């Protein structure tokens, strides 16, 4: 099977996308964070294909991707008033809220859990698909489990070409920074995964305590699909950069110069110009730093590096979400 590329400027291609979903196919589409792959919630064989295509453990649930929270109402229950405050401020956008599910959500979607995640992407292409499709799309990120998420059409095709029916092109900016996942079934509410919207943002908006959790952590899973040893160094800036120089000198000798370094803009003034250095970008542009991380690591893979040493940034404000994302792919995190 050859994966078809759909044109977001072509009206007929949206109808084709809806037809694919109705007939049990798998469709890849952009969101404001990364590309996703989705299927019709009520087609069990199509949903199971998502797991098989991604090589995803069946114990991990999928989420419902909808055009608005209102569409999701028949599928969720015990919805707190706070959900509508969050909807007003953040949706559509990079926030997934977890609710108790109704019996209308099949157990094969939620891995037999009584909860379900609801995501309302703001991307215009997704919104158009969801509004035309008369069912519910269940989805997850468009990549093999444990691999870097896809933030471009080319990355989707590199990973999934031939295993899905179609993928939409995309002209919108995709950050690579994951959506925030907030569990509204617990008291206090719990941030399962940090993203563009921080726990502090949510706590301030709702005027109540919100806990942070590492339940969504996937540390080390990238090692299943990559030979890269990713080491993140975090702490005070001078200590971090001194440690990076130390590690670079050590590992360059041990690995015959197959060591890459990832620094924030300007840090080379402290470390000096180390061979195989790439840059994450400015700490003042955190929204683009995660995507820079993915792009640079992919480049290091192509250059046959063994080790990549990454400069950690401050975890203040949205820096927490950036570090949470980067560290989830690290084989080692060193605090100095």
Each language-model region and where it sits:
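Active-site-adjacent structural elements in enzyme catalytic cores
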Residues: 1-336
């Amino acid at each position: 099977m050859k994966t078809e590329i759909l044109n977001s400027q072509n009206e007929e291609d949206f109808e084709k996308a809806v037809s694919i979903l109705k007939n049990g196919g798998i469709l890849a589409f952009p969101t404001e964070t990364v590309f996703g792959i989705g299927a019709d919630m009520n087609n069990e064989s199509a949903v199971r294909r998502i797991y098989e295509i991604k090589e995803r453990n069946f114990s991990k649930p999928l989420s419902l991707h909808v055009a608005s929270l209102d569409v999701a109402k028949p599928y969720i229950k015990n919805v707190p008033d706070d959900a509508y405050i969050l909807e007003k401020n953040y949706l559509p956008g990079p926030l997934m809220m977890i609710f108790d599910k109704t019996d209308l959500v099949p157990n094969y979607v939620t891995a037999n859990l009584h909860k379900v995640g609801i995501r309302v992407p703001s991307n215009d292409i997704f919104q158009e698909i969801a509004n035309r499709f008369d069912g519910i799309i269940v989805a997850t990120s468009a990549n093999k489990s444990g691999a870097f998420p896809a933030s471009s059409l080319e990355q989707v095709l590199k990973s999934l070409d031939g295993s899905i029916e179609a993928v939409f092109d995309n002209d919108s900016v995709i950050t690579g920074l994951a959506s925030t996942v907030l569990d509204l079934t617990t008291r206090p509410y719990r941030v399962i995964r940090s993203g563009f919207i921080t726990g502090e943002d949510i706590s301030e908006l709702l005027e109540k305590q919100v806990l942070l959790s590492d339940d969504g952590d996937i540390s080390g899973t990238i090692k299943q699909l990559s030979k890269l040893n990713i080491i993140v160094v975090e702490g005070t800036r001078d200590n971090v950069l001194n440690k990076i120089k130390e590690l670079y000198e050590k590992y360059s000798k041990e690995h015959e110069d197959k060591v890459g370094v990832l620094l924030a803009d300007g840090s080379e003034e402290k470390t000096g110009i180390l061979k195989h250095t790439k840059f994450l970008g400015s700490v003042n542009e955190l929204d683009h730093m995660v995507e820079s991380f993915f792009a640079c690591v992919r480049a290091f893979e192509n250059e046959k590096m063994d080790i990549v040493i990454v400069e950690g940034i401050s975890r203040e404000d949205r820096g927490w979400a950036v570090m949470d994302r980067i560290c989830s792919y690290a084989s080692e995190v060193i605090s100095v």
